[in-house]
Amino acid sequence: MEKSGPQRRRLAAALRLLSVEGVNSDGPKEVYAEAAEMLEEVVKGLRKEPRRMRRVGFRQGKDGFGKREFDFGMVDLSPVSGLANPLAPPLRVQRNEEKRATGTVVYPGSVRTGTGWVHHGYVAASVDEVFGAVLAWMGQPIMTGILDVRFLRPCPVEEEVRIDGWVRRESGGVVFTEARVEVAEGPVAEAHAVFFIVGEDQYKRFEEQRNRKLVAGC
């Protein structure tokens, strides 16, 4: 991945633009037929390449807060924030404090609903991603248990959206989080979530199952 990373990200960026043009353009059928044939050939070529195995676990060393970050094996490949994943808008997340992070994203026109706004499912996924980043930096191998998003107004496409997420409290193996979603015009949504700490061993089992399926072509 390290050697091909820049070109993977370039490919993903091109595919994002393709998705927007595929939705917004209105050309003759021949244009789309030609594009489809070209892409189908590209897919055939990529399917001949080896499958990429993912690795999870704690990273070496500690950060400035004395924590060991947990790597979910999704660097660059997350469907929400991965620069090498064409499905990602992508969301960019920065750490502010030990238990707080901020995400920014500009949703493309390809996620526009019939009313012209961003599909709320994308906003909810972005909130979940910000929470996951906070907990990964805290060294917590977690899974989402409950994600409750209350929308206050529609979310615009092609405008910067800011998501602030933080840990409200921890109790045993459960972490409670909150978030606020805003655009220039004001608040878009408020969110609360409950995460369960599942541990590194459980994530290792998930990793093994996932990699076996990749090898089998599932």
What would you call each of these model-derived segments?
Residues 1-67, 155-157, 168-218:
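HotDog/MaoC-like acyl-thioester-processing domains
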Residues 96-100, 118-142:
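Active-site helix/loop of acyl-thioester processing domains in fatty-acid/polyketide metabolism
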Residues 101-103, 147, 163, 177, ...:
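Hydrophobic residues positioned within well-ordered beta-strands of beta-sheet architectures
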Residues 94-96, 166-170:
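Short beta-strand micro-motifs enriched in acidic
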Residues 34-111:
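Long amphipathic N-terminal alpha/beta scaffold segment
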Residues 107-121:
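Short histidine-centered catalytic/ligand-binding loop motif
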Residues 1-2, 29, 130-162, 167:
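Hydrophobic beta-strand-centered segment that forms part of the acyl-chain substrate-binding groove
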